[in-house]
UniProtKB/Swiss-Prot annotation:
Its cofactor is Mg(2+). GO terms for cellular component: cytoplasm. The keyword Oxidoreductase does not apply. Its EC number is 2.4.2.17. It comes from Solibacter usitatus (strain Ellin6076). CDD domains: PBP2_HisGL3 (cd13593). Pfam families: HisG, HisG_C. It comes from the Bacteria. This is ATP phosphoribosyltransferase.
Length: 289
């Protein structure tokens, strides 16, 4: 069995390869090849632009791939959604395709764009959005650098954003969200019906989701005398349920828990003050629920 897997080339490429690394797969790329190596003999990788991924998966050229929900909807691709994977090129959340106009313009809502020109890479989705709102506008395909087009080359744009910083830098304001998107692991319908390929995809899904669950988390373990256990547990977040086990000395216990990495610098000193000893913080690659 060989699973042909599409890795998104471009802005999501590095984040995707890093996610696979956290999941236990080593993917190696070369600037001269569109076929990255992977340390799994059951997988063959190919670099494909996210915009085209769903089409190649639908047609069976690829068994599976990772792409945005935005491009699946744009291509109206008939694929099997295997998993929602909430990560992006700069962050680990969803991205938005937004309708934006110049800050100095009088446009306030989508209805103000009647008869205007809208530039975007997401043409079909934007046309459906405008039709839903009953607005007739000219939607033009943009090959890139879309933010610089208003007000000379377009009246408005529909563009993807994570933080909005690029839009603000180009003096644009958001007047509506057209679509929220996140990365999805998708499969060809026939491949999903193949028992061996489906098993492999389910394994990949579990490992990738486990890697995402571990992002921003760390493990913390410490020893505590039984007389100080209540004080130590009082320091830990109320919703966390640590694992508590006895040591060889019955007077002492080991406490093991998972915490948000951002909270550890405040919690460790308090654990020490509460009687914790031998405190060890360690990184996590996967949390499989």
């Amino acid at each position: 069995m060989l699973l042909k897997l599409g890795i998104p080339k471009g802005s999501l490429e590095n984040a995707t390869i890093d996610l696979f690394r956290r999941a236990g797969f080593q993917i190696t790329t070369s600037s001269r090849s569109y076929f990255p190596g992977i340390d799994d003999p059951e997988i063959e990788c190919m670099l494909i632009r996210a915009q085209e991924m769903a089409r190649y998966v639908e047609d069976g050229i690829l068994d599976s791939g990772l792409t945005g929900r935005d491009w699946i909807e744009e291509n109206e691709a008939a694929i099997v959604p295997v998993a929602d994977l909430i990560y992006a090129k700069q962050s680990f959340g969803k991205v938005r395709w937004v309708l934006a106009v110049p800050e100095a313009s009088s446009f306030r809502t989508v209805h103000d764009l009647e008869g205007k020109i809208i530039a975007t890479e997401l043409v079909a989705t934007t046309k459906r959005y405008m039709a839903k709102h009953g607005v007739k506008a000219k939607v033009e395909f943009s090959w890139g650098a879309t933010e610089v087009k208003p007000p000379v080359l377009a009246d408005a744009i529909v563009e993807v954003t994570e933080t909005g910083s690029s839009l603000r830098a180009n003096k644009l304001k958001i007047i509506d969200t057209v679509l929220e998107s996140n990365t999805q692991l998708i499969a060809n319908k026939a491949s999903w019906e193949d028992p061996e390929k489906r098993r492999k995809l389910e394994d990949i899904r579990m490992l990738l989701q486990g890697a995402i669950n571990a992002l921003g988390k760390v493990g913390l373990m410490l020893n505590v005398h039984k007389d100080n256990l209540k004080a130590v547990l009082g320091v830990l977040p109320a919703l966390k349920r640590p694992t508590i086990s006895h040591l060889s000395d019955d007077e002492w216990l080991a406490v093991n828990t998972i915490l948000d990495e951002s909270t550890v610098r405040d919690i460790i000193p308090r654990l020490k003050q509460a009687g914790g000893e031998g405190i060890v913080e360690y990184p996590l690659n996967k949390i499989v629920l």
